[in-house]
Amino acid sequence: MQERYQPNSVEAAAQQTWQARDAYLVHEHAKNPDGSEKPKFYACSMLPYPSGKLHMGHVRNYTINDMMARQLRMRGYNVLMPMGWDAFGMPAENAAIKSKVPPAKWTYDNIAYMKKQMKAMGLAIDWSREMCACDPKYYKWNQWLFLKMLEKGIAYRKTQVVNWDPVDQTVLANEQVIDGRGWRSGAPVEKREIPGYYLRITDYAEELLDQVSTNLPGWPERVRLMQENWIGKSEGLRFAFPHRIAGADGKLIQDGKLYVFTTRADTIMGVTFCAVAPEHPLATHAAQSNPALAAFVEQCKLGGTTEAEMATREKEGMPTGLTVTHPLTGAEIDVWVGNYVLMTYGDGAVMGVPAHDERDFAFARKYGLPIRQVVALEGKTYSTDAWQEWYGDKQAGRTVNSGKYDGLAYQAAVDTIAADLAAQGLGEKQTTWRLRDWGISRQRYWGTPIPIIHCADCGPVPVPEQDLPVVLPDDLIPDGSGNPLAKNEAFLSCSCPRCGKPARRETDTMDTFVDSSWYFMRYTSPDNDQAMVDARNDYWMPMDQYIGGIEHAVLHLLYARFWTKVMRDLGLLNFDEPFTKLLCQGMVLNHIYSRKTPQGGIEYFWPEEVDNVYDAKGAIVGAKLQRDGSEVNYGGVGTMSKSKNNGVDPQSLIDTLGADTARLFVMFASPPEQTLEWSDSGVEGANRFLRRLWALGYAQREAVGRGLATGADWAQAPAPVKELRREVYGLLKQADYDYQRIQYNTVVSACMKMLNAIDDAPLPEGPAADAARAETLGLLLRVLYPVVPHITWHLWQDLGYAEHLGDLLDAPWPHVDEAALVADEIELMLQVNGKLRGSIRVAAKAPKEDIERIAAAQEEVARFLEGRPPKRVIVVPGKLVNVVG
């Protein structure tokens, strides 16, 4: 055994041994030595995009997964921890444009490097199950399931107003528009009408919503709430404003009815205007004879189509000059075009009730529209000068200024008004959803080809199943001028499967969220080229623990739930939800330093380029560049980012201090679900702990060897030996509890305390002490092994544990020796007349009389009672004794 800890050689030796043994190769229905079947546990991290290098967020995510997998394997579980690559997507195309190499080469080069990094981290991954989204063997099943959904009517083609990213030249789902900008390019999103394929996720809205509360108890409450809000169930009234507006053909537009949906039918008597979406037929009709309105409509199309954007965009409108009729009063209601109205939600029109809707209130105040109060609260005075929250209270109010409906509470008003509108054939109660069908068509090259052939005679024709996969050419180099598939005759040209005539392939590819909606099931059946999944999927799924960022709460997780339910309904699996438990790890943060450039931009600096300036309390209040002493702005801490120069390269850390140091720091610095602030001193502290562990093993190697060979009679052991065992087993009990709670930072804390206890224990020479050293250090190595597997495995080998107890890879999780936790003696606080004066040690099972006698005989008692005899002695078992005099 070498005297000094050398992480590079230690980690290389361990990894070579594990790889030679296929240590993490997993099979279904694994057996215990007695022939019984091991329980399964499937723990999986969200698959990474192969961007080129791992970042610290990856290191944290995968270390959490690895700790869980290793510890549960020690507990006797058959544990699956796989890995794959979310390899399709726009970054590969953008990189190809820049470097003039095919996206396939860029992607596979990145995968090779990142896989090497993962292996250097010592992750317990079963690489035999590796999948890659851009592999035809994988995306064949995207295409196959799409065709099955097409057969069932779950997939369909339509033309719709969509979010168009003008930079990436593709359609974005609502969830991919952030603050009106494309989630990847950051470009302002436009509205366009374009044909594409959609999946009827709305058919599953009720089940998706219901099972958030019934089937996902192991998910964070925050994520469940985000899913509930995104699905967005609303129960209300859909009704019509009649009109006599005819189109160019002389027919009434939309049969003479402007439909709206509202959850506040009790306020219908307060309608003073209606607003329609820029794409609404009434807006189109009015714009034909109104150039100003036509220009406004075009301006509205420059924005995105999400509710989130509508909530933040300034509300603007323009009157159409058209009117509709109030269905209950007969009054003429002006129709406006509003930039905040979505054609894709409901009927593309809303009623305006300024008195009781904050958005309508602001709109009416801006454009001088009437505001009519129709709900009042007792003791409250209504004013049109400023919005007050009670204006929108639907539970406490009563209707006013509403004719026959005056004096009604919310539900009574809704029911009465709904009945009256239904009697006229103008309305009915209805449930609506925020959730929209999932548009999966993307006008990009690097994605799963949509298996459709377009024939001039037959129209869109599905590719026959036997012709799958439709293989994506992997040698094209995009030039930024649209989809290269549309210019590639070898891909485009084909024959119609139905009539045999020349035809053209669909050039749109699938949204990459299709790839990530079921990859975790392909891990279970990776080598099956005849079926999407097989019986092995039934063994492993549902997944026991999923690990990934909160940023995927709506996008990926909702799509994965939907995809699972579709596969279930197609008879491919027999469960409802894919993920039993979900852990969303916190972001990794680091300090941000910047200053403005002469051109008005912002220049960011690496933390190692600056020296901090501290105040009297040690807080950072500024910073200076090391190279010239000039001041830079300190921006606090933020998520590690390439653009802000505050990332830390994991590979550099692994090369210098080792993977175990990186793993230990990211697990110790913060609970898994909370943010982690990077600290160079914390990293050094983690490395110092590992050096201490190695030094302890080296110093005690001979004693450990003797202890492993001889054993001990613990009942007869000296008191210091018993005390060490009691402390270490107490820490083991705490660590065991924290492992089960996934509180890995306190697991590491317990291990540090164990090391201190073992290192500092004043043990006498002898067999019992040697046995205690061997036992307690062995416990520490096993508890610490899931965190830092390389150093613990090496010490286990070098100190002789493997010879006596087997390889650490297969070592069982240690059991707490409850007898060791029972102390021979206990310490009681000693009080005199209720004031603390010291302590006494007594036998753990000493009778009350003995405790009273020992306490009364203490020198402190005699001194503070000034020689008076005690009047009585009060014993609080296990805590204190109070002598009263």
UniProtKB/Swiss-Prot annotation:
Gene3D superfamilies associated with the record: 2.20.28.290, 3.10.20.590, HUPs, Isoleucyl-tRNA Synthetase, Domain 1
HAMAP family cross-referenced by the UniProt entry: Leu_tRNA_synth_B
Any one GO BP annotation for this protein: leucyl-tRNA aminoacylation
Catalysed reactions, semicolon-separated: tRNA(Leu) + L-leucine + ATP = L-leucyl-tRNA(Leu) + AMP + diphosphate
Locus of motif 'KMSKS' region: 639-643
Coiled-coil spans in chain: none
Protein name: Leucine--tRNA ligase
EC number: 6.1.1.4
Matches recorded under InterPro entries: aa-tRNA-synth_I_CS, aa-tRNA-synth_Ia, Leu-tRNA-ligase, Leu_tRNA-synth_edit, M/V/L/I-tRNA-synth_anticd-bd, Methionyl/Leucyl_tRNA_Synth, Rossmann-like_a/b/a_fold, tRNAsynth_Ia_anticodon-bd
GO MF annotation list: aminoacyl-tRNA deacylase activity; ATP binding; leucine-tRNA ligase activity
Alphabetized PANTHER family for the sequence: LEUCINE--TRNA LIGASE, MITOCHONDRIAL, LEUCYL-TRNA SYNTHETASE
One Pfam family per UniProt: tRNA-synt_1g
UniProt-annotated binding residues for ATP: 642
Family: Belongs to the class-I aminoacyl-tRNA synthetase family.
Motif ('HIGH' region): 48-58
Organism (species): Bordetella bronchiseptica (strain ATCC BAA-588 / NCTC 13252 / RB50)
GO cellular component terms, A-Z: cytosol
The entry's keywords: Aminoacyl-tRNA synthetase, ATP-binding, Cytoplasm, Ligase, Nucleotide-binding, Protein biosynthesis
Main location group: cytoplasm
Location in the cell: Cytoplasm
